[in-house]
Amino acid sequence: MNFDFSKLLEPQKAHVMKLMDSLYINGTAVDLSETGTGKSYSAAWVAKHFNSPVVVVCPKVVIPNWHNVLKEFGIKAHVVINFEKLTRGNTEHLSFLNGRDNTPDDYQIHFPKNALVIIDECHKCKGFDSKNSDFLIALKKNHYKLLLLSATAATNPLEMKSFGFATTLHNLVSFRSFVFDSGAYTGRFGGYQIDIGSRQAIEAMANIHDKLFNRFKVASRMTRKMFDKIFPDNRVIADVFDMGTNTDKINRIYEIMERELAELEESSSNYSEHHFAIMTKARRKVELLKVPTMVDMIKDLYDEGISPVVFVNFTDTVDAIINQLGKNNTYSQSVARIVGGQSDKARQADITDFQADRKRIMIANLAAGNAGVSLHDLNGNHPRHSILSPSFSAINMLQALGRIHRAEGKTPCVQKVLFAANTIEEDACRRVQAKLNNLESLNDGDLTFSVRVI
């Protein structure tokens, strides 16, 4: 068979053939390419040549992009739908047996039986018993051909219940032994836990990498280095910054947080839920105290002709930054935003204005703007620098790091992960770096224990 590779960049050609081979041999293929290397274009090429009905399940924010990419390849999808709408079970595409959605066996999927189902950002299916996880398991049980896309499919074996089943790492029944063999153990309250920095866990991730890429040949991955001059330079710096007079306030918040957590451990039977609430409350307060530093950095970058992109965790922080910038007309007319609750039209308008350099500052909520959004320099006039407030989620962080560093970017990128100096965040900085390295152990099979800052 003769294949038309004219719409693909050179590194994508061998990559798509590996995906095609795995779909025919394994029934599943996994694209674990780095962000910005063209996973959607590669998937569309595969769909074009696979010659089956095409279903795309993806985050809502990237639905327009999927329609555009499929159209470029002459494909009209059976449906392009977001996870949340689909898994509610009230569309023609999915229903629940007897109105229940307790297990994957309750999921009645109504896609064409010979459909190729593309799951974009498949890390959204990593939950142990989430709806998305059950949906992916149901797809595999119903023998659909699956093309899974994510730069960050999972950080550890506990997140591989559905992913591992789809890629035959386990058969669900063997999931318990799969995670225990990978270094997991039963925690204080009965759930599974794992030390992702342990030698056993790191070796397990390397073994999983070997199975996916070499033994099963179910996965393929493109890196930015493969694209030579197509990608600009990219420097990621995780560092601590002086928060000035707010440093003492930040330390005080963390002291209160630690005391509340200690009291909770002694008194609460529902430790996990309250633990998360206490942590979130403290992080929200601390992030607001970083706003003056972030605003100063934004202004400095803007004045240098750079277009800054700022990723934060809370809408309160987005509002505070925009309010501070709004006090000066130089900056107030140039601010774009990506936040939860924003209409699709307003969000896309701001992204378009930023990409066209009509707006020069982008403030994004990490949860809303970390996946599927392109914010790279298309024109060569205003290099992109990002400022990231750490989320302590390696997946969110790595996805955000791929927003300004993408194929065909015209200028080098600098990305700074912002930690507060002289606080316990100095330890958190090292933990985040460790998580980012552990993601690479899934993608690159890196056995080293080193912390790497690019």
Model-derived regions: residue spans:
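Conserved RecA-like P-loop NTPase helicase motor core
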Residues: 318, 336-428, 435
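Conserved helicase/translocase motor-coupling segment
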Residues: 224-327
